[in-house]
């Protein structure tokens, strides 16, 4: 029987989704991205070789898997072709296995210019975007003035639509932000060139997924960023511009909600956040520095240093409800090796009261102080362990406590960056 499995990040992104998608595609016929853009950075390590993907689904490293980019993704034609070029340079076949939705909103150079101009204008109140034009492209999509991937086929009508869009945005860039405008002819020439390469890969992704469902094919839906960066449910305004929760898999691909069978939440054994925004369990001491350095907590897309802190069970309970999690994949357990004590946030102090929920809004959330429960650490190495019983006793106790405090079973444990450094307790494709 066909299984549709959704993989999402449960925290603030960078949880290790790429590795798990790559691992699970052994059982999948297709992998589809459903939101975000090339602001994502999914790092895969296979047989010691590191690959970082930003836009193309993580299943691309398996020759038998079809990869799709759904309508919920904002697509940079330039970034897509650059990524294809990098993968083809190491001998991978890409273009015959990649299908891009005609309904994808396009990211243009003017969106990048707007993104950077806005962040500069915000100064100390900057959101901390990746500067890739994601937000402005989503704005144009919602305002119904943006270009879509299918428009690349209409070479006759493209110039007029592009000029209208650039006139609108260049007015804002030059008159309001005092920045340089974006050149029309240069943008048009680039789009026509890139369009000729991308158009053969365009297709009706929703229709293809419907056919897969009818044919009994397994499909993996790959989320980007994390649930607490969701435009509606995250720590607004320090969020991304798309729905990063599991519900985004439906509207971002055209697959109905009742067709999803399992939602796997990828969760670090501690917490990280990149950019600005409230982070109650953040560690600004030597332990935080250990997590940063040992966990190599630097962004795959921007190289920015990630802030590190203890696991937040309050946030995870919220995330579990928002996403309807079926199970958790716990990643980077090995980063905690050697710590004498490990903390878990089980509640917050908020305006003098103890609460066990996440307040709405960044200003309210910033007033929360974590209530930390400490557990003994372990000195043994967990790196590369592939059987649950081989983990140190204190590591197993830590995992059990995470299950108790979040209310969700840990079905998979990642003990290292390589595809095989994994303990699979319950395979989502085999779940009843």
Curated annotation (Swiss-Prot):
GO molecular function: adenylosuccinate synthase activity; GTP binding; magnesium ion binding
Residues noted as binding GTP in the record, renumbered to the chain: 13-19, 41-43, 306, 332-334, 414-416
Pathway: Purine metabolism; AMP biosynthesis via de novo pathway; AMP from IMP: step 1/2
Entry EC number(s): 6.3.4.4
PROSITE patterns: ADENYLOSUCCIN_SYN_1, ADENYLOSUCCIN_SYN_2
Location in the cell: Cytoplasm
Residues that hold IMP according to the record: 14-17, 39-42, 130, 144, 225, 240, 304
Cofactor: Mg(2+)
Catalytic reactions of this protein: IMP + L-aspartate + GTP = N(6)-(1,2-dicarboxyethyl)-AMP + GDP + phosphate + 2 H(+)
GTP-binding in keyword set: yes
CDD domains: AdSS
Entry binding sites for Mg(2+): 14, 41
Listed InterPro entries: Adenylosuccin_syn_GTP-bd, Adenylosuccin_syn_Lys_AS, Adenylosuccinate_synth_dom1, Adenylosuccinate_synth_dom2, Adenylosuccinate_synth_dom3, Adenylosuccinate_synthetase, P-loop_NTPase
Cofactor note: Binds 1 Mg(2+) ion per subunit.
Keywords from the named record: Cytoplasm, GTP-binding, Ligase, Magnesium, Metal-binding, Nucleotide-binding, Purine biosynthesis
Coiled coil (residue ranges): none
Gene Ontology cellular component list: cytoplasm
Residues bound to substrate: 300-306
Active-site residues (renumbered): 14, 42
GO biological process, one term: 'de novo' AMP biosynthetic process
Family annotation (PANTHER family): ADENYLOSUCCINATE SYNTHETASE
Family: Belongs to the adenylosuccinate synthetase family.
Subunit note: Homodimer.
Functional summary from the UniProt entry: Plays an important role in the de novo pathway of purine nucleotide biosynthesis. Catalyzes the first committed step in the biosynthesis of AMP from IMP.
Name of the protein: Adenylosuccinate synthetase
Gene name tied to this protein: purA
């Amino acid at each position: 029987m066909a299984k549709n499995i959704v993989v999402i990040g449960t925290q603030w992104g960078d949880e290790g989704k790429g590795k798990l998608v790559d691992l699970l595609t052994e059982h999948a016929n297709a992998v589809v991205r459903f939101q975000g853009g090339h602001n994502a950075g999914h790092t895969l390590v296979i047989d010691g070789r590191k690959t970082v993907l930003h836009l193309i689904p993580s299943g691309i490293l398996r020759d038998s898997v079809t990869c799709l980019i759904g309508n919920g993704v904002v697509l940079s034609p330039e970034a897509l072709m650059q990524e294809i070029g990098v993968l083809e340079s190491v001998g991978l076949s890409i273009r015959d296995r990649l299908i891009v939705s005609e309904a994808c909103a396009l990211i243009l150079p003017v969106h990048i210019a707007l993104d950077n101009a806005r962040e500069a204008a915000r100064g100390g109140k900057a959101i901390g975007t990746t500067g890739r034009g994601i937000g402005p492209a989503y704005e144009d999509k919602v305002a119904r003035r943006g270009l879509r991937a299918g428009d690349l086929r209409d070479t006759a009508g493209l110039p007029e639509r592009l000029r209208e869009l650039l006139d609108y945005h260049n007015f804002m860039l030059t008159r309001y932000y005092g920045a340089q405008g974006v050149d029309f002819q240069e943008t048009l020439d680039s789009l026509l060139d890139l369009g000729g390469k991308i158009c053969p890969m365009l297709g009706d992704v929703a229709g293809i997924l419907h056919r897969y469902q009818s044919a009994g094919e397994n499909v993996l839906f790959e989320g980007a960023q994390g649930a607490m960066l969701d435009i509606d449910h995250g720590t607004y305004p320090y969020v991304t511009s798309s729905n990063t929760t599991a519900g985004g898999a439906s509207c971002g691909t055209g697959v109905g909600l009742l067709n999803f069978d399992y939602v796997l939440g990828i969760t670090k054994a501690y917490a990280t956040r990149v950019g600005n925004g409230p982070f109650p369990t953040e560690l600004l001491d030597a332990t935080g520095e250990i997590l940063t350095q040992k966990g190599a907590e630097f962004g795959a897309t921007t190289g920015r240093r990630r802030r590190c802190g203890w696991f937040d069970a309050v946030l995870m309970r919220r995330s579990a409800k928002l996403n309807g999690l079926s199970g958790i994949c716990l990643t980077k357990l090995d980063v905690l090796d050697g710590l004498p004590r490990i903390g878990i946030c089980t509640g917050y102090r908020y305006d003098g009261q103890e609460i066990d929920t996440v307040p709405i809004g960044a200003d309210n959330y910033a007033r929360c102080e974590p209530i930390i429960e400490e557990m003994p650490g372990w000195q043994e190495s967990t790196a590369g362990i592939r059987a649950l019983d081989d983990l140190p006793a204190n590591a197993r106790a830590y995992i059990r406590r995470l299950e108790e405090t979040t209310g969700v079973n840990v079905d998979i444990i990642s003990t290292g960056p390589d595809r095989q450094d994994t303990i699979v307790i319950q395979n989502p494709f085999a779940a009843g």
